[in-house]
């Protein structure tokens, strides 16, 4: 027994020593990675000395980088019969050179034999005399400092940093050529259009704020006599699919949405799920996984996400996926009638946190689809499940139910704009009203998306912070009014779904307690 205890003590000491060593090594690595301070007082070498030239065996092109305060030789290998690499050789000297030929270890051409064909994988095209063709090198048309093979021009242009600015919006232009594109088809064209600016709450008088707060209380009591039902339960597939704490909050919200879809008979592996405002498509992936990878999906978003390839591949490359497509298009211009798959498969409209007027465009797109399609499409349409958010960026011109504002609320367009602004108060936090709200999180993997989110957040914070300077309401009262404003905006959408889309079985649900953006509109036929 004594020997066993001694061995345990030795092992524990060894583990402790190893842990300390690993921590120390990690610390050293971090210290090495830290940027060294640049001493700009030391003059840069404009030209190399003969000693520098003699000691350098690679390309002898001298690079002076004033930004990094560094001067050094290029580190690429020299080209054949030259003191420079192919990148730095004059273009007239490298305009043509033989294309390399791939060989195996026996010196033979590398080929792949398939059942139906033989494909040569050599990097050269040979003529009758078995002489490799020459590849021409040219300047990049976007940046003359880039020298590339002419045969690889198109590939280079896709990755060229100078092309990225134009590429950010290229998909928007390309979408105009698609059969499902129709200019402003979902722009609620029957609406009254007025010239209205967003209302800044700091510019609203105390009297107007008090008057609109009284109306909000009255309307909320009228339309929401009973509390909105809450179903904050994860789906049965949750524990089987996810076993980590990474982004647990969002995963739980998605699981709760799936649970509500199932309870509303909108959950079936035969369905094609159209996710509006899909972002990187995590809700669709969660639905797909919960169906044991046996469902169809159409992801719709006007943004182009770098990370979309990750989630998209998780769905479309599976054998059980009976349909997949991603539509890079603004919902305002999406003509669902030209999606042929909707005639072939039952489909459900879904979304998690569909921002502002995008919800209204989505409802209008469904209205246009059901009124302009054949009986097959109408029969295949099973229902809607939409989680709304960002009511503060809604506006009168694009609101889906203007008749509700006029006939039931009896408010003016300006009063509606004020209600939209007040809805931003729902997400005020007493301790950190300036901090970003993770509940409306989108994948920030593209500069365009970062800019779009930043502008939206600046506008939201302006509405939150720049309230009337007399501080008419307490923080708690503001949150209450903001919540009521959101629900009244959603109530008009609820009536639109029931009356215009002819879906009387429409319900409100509170689907999460982890976010103040927590309302889910669900309806089935």
UniProtKB/Swiss-Prot annotation:
Catalysed conversion reaction: cytidine(4) in tRNA(Pro) + S-adenosyl-L-methionine = 2'-O-methylcytidine(4) in tRNA(Pro) + S-adenosyl-L-homocysteine + H(+); cytidine(4) in tRNA(Gly)(GCC) + S-adenosyl-L-methionine = 2'-O-methylcytidine(4) in tRNA(Gly)(GCC) + S-adenosyl-L-homocysteine + H(+); adenosine(4) in tRNA(His) + S-adenosyl-L-methionine = 2'-O-methyladenosine(4) in tRNA(His) + S-adenosyl-L-homocysteine + H(+)
Origin: domain of life: Eukaryota
Region (Disordered): 31-50, 91-137
Keyword Acetylation assigned: no
EC number(s) on file: 2.1.1.225
Magnesium recorded as keyword: no
Zinc finger (CHHC U11-48K-type): 137-164
Cited InterPro entries: Methyltransferase_TRM13, Trm13, TRM13/UPF0224_CHHC_Znf_dom, Znf_CCCH-type_TRM13
Record's compositionally biased regions (Polar residues): 93-104
Gene Ontology terms: biological process: tRNA methylation
Keywords assigned: Coiled coil, Metal-binding, Methyltransferase, S-adenosyl-L-methionine, Transferase, tRNA processing, Zinc, Zinc-finger
Positions that bind Zn(2+): 140, 146, 156, 160
Pfam families in the record: TRM13, zf-TRM13_CCCH, zf-U11-48K
Biased composition (Basic and acidic residues): 38-50
Start-end of Low complexity biased regions: 112-127
Gene Ontology molecular function: tRNA 2'-O-methyltransferase activity; tRNA methyltransferase activity; zinc ion binding
Coiled coil: 440-469
Family, similarity comment: Belongs to the methyltransferase TRM13 family.
Function: tRNA methylase which 2'-O-methylates cytidine(4) in tRNA(Pro) and tRNA(Gly)(GCC), and adenosine(4) in tRNA(His).
Protein name, as recorded: tRNA:m(4)X modification enzyme TRM13 homolog
């Amino acid at each position: 027994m004594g020997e066993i205890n001694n061995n345990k003590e030795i092992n524990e000491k060894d583990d402790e020593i190893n842990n300390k060593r690993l921590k120390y090594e990690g610390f050293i690595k971090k210290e090495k990675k830290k940027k060294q301070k640049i001493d700009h007082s030391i003059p840069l070498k404009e030209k190399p000395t003969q000693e520098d030239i003699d000691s350098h065996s690679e390309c002898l092109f001298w690079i002076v980088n004033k930004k990094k305060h560094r001067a050094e030789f290029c580190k690429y290998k020299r080209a054949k019969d030259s003191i420079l690499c192919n990148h730095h050789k004059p273009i007239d000297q490298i305009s043509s050179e033989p294309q390399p030929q791939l060989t195996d270890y026996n010196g033979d051409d590398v080929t792949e034999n398939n059942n139906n064909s033989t494909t040569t994988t050599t990097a050269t095209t040979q003529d009758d005399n078995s002489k490799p063709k020459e590849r021409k090198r040219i300047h990049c048309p976007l940046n003359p400092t880039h020298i590339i093979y002419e045969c690889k021009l198109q590939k280079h242009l896709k990755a060229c940093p100078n092309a990225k600015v134009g590429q950010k919006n290229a998909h928007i232009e390309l979408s105009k050529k698609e059969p499902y594109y129709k200019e402003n088809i979902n722009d609620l064209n029957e609406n009254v259009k007025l010239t209205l600016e967003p209302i800044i709450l700091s510019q609203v008088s105390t009297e107007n704020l008090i008057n609109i707060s009284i109306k909000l209380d009255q309307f909320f009591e009228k339309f929401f006599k009973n509390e909105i039902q809450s179903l904050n339960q994860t789906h049965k597939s949750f524990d089987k699919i996810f076993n980590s704490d990474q982004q647990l909050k969002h995963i739980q919200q998605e699981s709760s949405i799936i649970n509500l879809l199932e309870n509303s008979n909108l959950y079936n592996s035969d369905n094609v799920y159209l996710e509006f405002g899909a972002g990187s498509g995590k809700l669709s992936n969660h639905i797909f996984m919960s169906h044991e990878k046996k469902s169809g999906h159409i992801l719709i978003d006007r943004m182009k996400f770098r990370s979309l390839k990750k989630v998209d591949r998780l769905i479309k490359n599976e054998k059980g996926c009976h349909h997949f497509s991603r539509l890079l298009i603004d919902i305002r211009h999406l003509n669902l009638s030209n999606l042929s798959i909707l005639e072939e498969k039952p489909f459900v409209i879904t979304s998690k946190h569909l921002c502002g007027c995008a919800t209204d465009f989505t409802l209008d797109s469904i209205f246009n689809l059901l009124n302009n399609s054949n009986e097959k499409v109408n029969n295949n349409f099973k229902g809607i499940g939409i989680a709304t958010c960002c009511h503060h960026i809604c506006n009168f011109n694009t609101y889906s139910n203007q008749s509700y504002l006029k006939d039931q609320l009896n408010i003016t367009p300006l009063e509606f704009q004020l209600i939209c602004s007040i809805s931003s108060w729902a997400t005020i936090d007493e301790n950190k009203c300036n901090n970003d709200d993770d509940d409306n999180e989108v994948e920030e993997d593209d500069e365009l998306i970062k800019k779009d989110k930043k502008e939206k957040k600046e506008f939201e914070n302006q509405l939150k912070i720049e309230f009337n300077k007399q501080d008419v309401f307490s923080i708690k009262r503001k949150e209450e009014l903001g919540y009521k404003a959101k629900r009244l905006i959603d109530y008009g959408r609820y009536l639109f779904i029931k009356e215009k889309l002819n879906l009387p079985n429409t319900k409100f649900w509170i689907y999460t307690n982890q976010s103040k953006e927590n309302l889910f509109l669900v309806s089935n036929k």
